[in-house]
Each structure stands twice: as C-alpha cells, then as structure tokens.
Amino acid sequence: MIVKTRAIVLREIRYRDQSKICSLFTREFGLLSVIIKGGRNPKSKLAGRFIAGTVLDIVLYKKTTREIQLVSEGNLLFSPMVPQPDIERYAIMYRIIDLVSQSIDGQEKNIPLFSLIASVLEELYSTSDRFRLLYSWFLLKLVSLLGFEPSIHRCVLSHEEISPATLAENKGELCFLFNPGGVALPASKSVIENENRPLSMATYALLSAISSTPLNLLKNIEAIPPQTDLLCNLLEEYCTLHLVHHPHKKNIAIVSQILSE
C-alpha cells in the first residue's frame, strides 16, 4: 500500500554501501523503521534529506507484515542544516529528539505530540538565539502532554492561588515539587518531606510566563540567560523523572555536558 505522511527523523544508521535505515516518528503511523535505498549516494534524489532532526513529507510502501518500510519520496520541510550552524542549536535538537524517542509508545500514533515536535523544530531552525528558552517551553508542553502537567498558578499542596499577596506573605519563597508536580508555598511541612527544588521569584515569573505564552509569541518574553538556565535545568529534571523509558541515558549525559559548557 502506497501512503503519504509527514515524518520526523529520529535516528539514522548506515546500511550496506549506499543506503540507510532510519527511525521515523510519523504523523499518521507513529514510530516506523524505514529503508532509504541509495540514501547515501550523492546522486540520489533522497541524499542529504533523511538526517536526524529533519521534518519531511514522505511517500512509502507500507506493509503491515514488514518491520522495515520502503520510502520512495521525501520532500524536505525543515532541516537543522541552516545557513548559520550553531552547536547549541544542535545540542537542543538532539535532546528534543532523544526525549521524543523515550516518549513514544511503540507504533501508536500521537498527533498532538507530533504537532508539538514539528512546530518546535521549525522554530528552532528559524531562530538564531534563545534556544534554551524555546527548549524550556518545549519541556513544559511535553510533560503536560504526557499527563504530568505541573501546577503553576496554584499551590500543588494547598491549592491556594499563588497571587502577589500570597507571595508577599511568604516573602517570595517558593518550592518546585517533583511529586506531586508543581509549585508549592513553603508553609506546609510536606514540602520538606517531598523532593523539591527552591524556586526564586524571577524563575517562577519566567515559568508562569512560558506556561501561558503560545509558541509564536515566545520571542516577546524577556528573560536573562541565568534564569533561563535555571528553569531549563529544573524542567529537564522534572521531565526526565516522569518519562517511563530511559534507553538513552548516555546520550542525555553527553548533550547535558555540551549545554553546560
């Protein structure tokens, strides 16, 4: 059966002399393994298109009895091979697709997750800076989509609204709890008993801002790098904690090291 779908390349490996096998996250079929015949031949029409992080519209011959599907066409939409390469952009891109690989459950399709990944990658490849702010936004949306949305505007323990008056009463001191997930006022003893991280007012303000800002308006958020880094590290720790599968911990450590340099 010949089918069309949009796909994100998660991984590629060499196969024989000139071909490659890729792991794709597709809009209609979820996770697929495909073969790109001649994909490493410079003369092939598919050469250079199926690399990690690219988003394409593809045509493939799909058989339910076959584990690896055959791709016949690939129209490139977004690619990390932008005119001005940046090592931090690549590090963020690899971290995103690594988290996606952990989040996908078999071949089950997940259109909301696919749409999130595709839109974030498109934005990542079109911007020239503030990659960590975009990554923080992605982490928050991803963990929320997976069913672990943290409570941000109400205390996760008391359910009290976190208002300016409440913050003043608590001298601006907040905590972020991993379980249950969300922001907490420090008045409760439970905060001490649960795993938590201190949350400054500046970091909380940034968290609150990105939680209510659509992707196309993210550029309007004012954030200094130190606060973005703190929030990014916090959300990555929270997100990783709640992912069920952890097959690529070595990759996570490598990318985290790149981002910290």
From Swiss-Prot:
Coiled coil, from the record: none
Species: Chlorobium phaeobacteroides (strain DSM 266 / SMG 266 / 2430)
Gene that specifies this protein: recO
GO terms for cellular component: bacterial nucleoid
UniProt function note: Involved in DNA repair and RecF pathway recombination.
InterPro entries: ARFGAP/RecO (IPR037278), DNA_rep/recomb_RecO_N (IPR022572), NA-bd_OB-fold (IPR012340), RecO (IPR003717), RecO_C (IPR042242)
Keywords tagged on the record: DNA damage, DNA recombination, DNA repair
Lineage summary: Bacteria, Pseudomonadati, Chlorobiota, Chlorobiia, Chlorobiales
UniProt-listed GO biological process terms: DNA recombination; double-strand break repair
Family that this chain belongs to: Belongs to the RecO family.
Keyword DNA repair: yes
Protein name: DNA repair protein RecO
Keyword DNA damage in annotation: yes
